[in-house]
Amino acid sequence: MTNFSRRQVLSLPMAASVVGADAAGAAYAADSNSKVNAPDFDAIEDRMTLLTKRGASLSIRQKHLAMLSVAASLGFEDLGERTAAAALADGLAPGDIEEAVFHASPYAGMARTRAVLAGVHTAMTAAGIALPLESRTVVSDENRLQKGIAVQTEIFGEQITRMHQTTPAERRSLMIDDLSGWCFGDFYTRKGLTIAERELATFCTIAALGGCEAQLSAHAAANLRCGNTKDNLIDALQCAVVYLGFPRTLNACAVVDKVNF
């Protein structure tokens, strides 16, 4: 195979079929249509996104789910394209890549995730993947709330029962119908990602928002209950520090240090 750099390869059409397994975890490519022409800047970004050198406790799949979740939270279409192209090149299923972006919606908001999804679909189209992908929805209008409460309770236990009992009447539409029905019913129930993977994705998404330490702490604890470790959470932050920046990364690390379950 021609010895392209990762940056060159991921700017080509059909990137996912050109990159071999030997390139797994290599650096992200700059958008070929970028207005930035700064090789030094690109070289630093390449170094910081070389996933084989980052996140030692995580699988390559987990690393890409973390990166996709952070991209979804930040809301930049070009970053969505690059994160998706890299994940495709490392063998992640198109549906799982899309799912990681979908999953961020109740946390980052659907305006941001829609923008990132546009970039994801650009990468998939370039790789010859037919869209739309197969539906992963498993709930209906009639059962989404019930199914959402079930998975929410599976993760958080009796906290959910107590919350439902103590939520004031004027907030029940928001805290039960929307939180349980939309966030958990519409998204957590979907096929493709495990609950542990979804909680890791949620942690990364909230960390990228910044200033949401109460929610970040709750989901850090949920990660531990689902079988993820503190090392997994710190390593996910290390994978994505190049896009998180240090202030949000260090704040998230402090949350992990304090969390128990």
What are these regions (language model features)?
Residues 70-77, 108-109, 205-212, 245:
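Short alpha-helix boundary/capping elements
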Residues 2-4, 9-62, 78-85, 89, ...:
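Acidic, glycine/proline-rich low-complexity segments that act as flexible tails and inter-domain linkers
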Residues 88-100, 222-235, 240:
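Short, mixed-charge aromatic SLiMs
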Residues 53, 74-78, 92, 210, ...:
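Residues in soluble alpha-helical coiled-coils and helical-bundle/repeat scaffolds
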Residues 62-71, 97-101, 197-207, 216, ...:
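Short, structured motif recognition centered on aromatic/hydrophobic residues
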Residues 194-203, 207-231:
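Glycine/small-residue-rich hydrophobic helix-like segments
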Residues 99, 108-111:
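Substrate/cofactor-recognition hotspot
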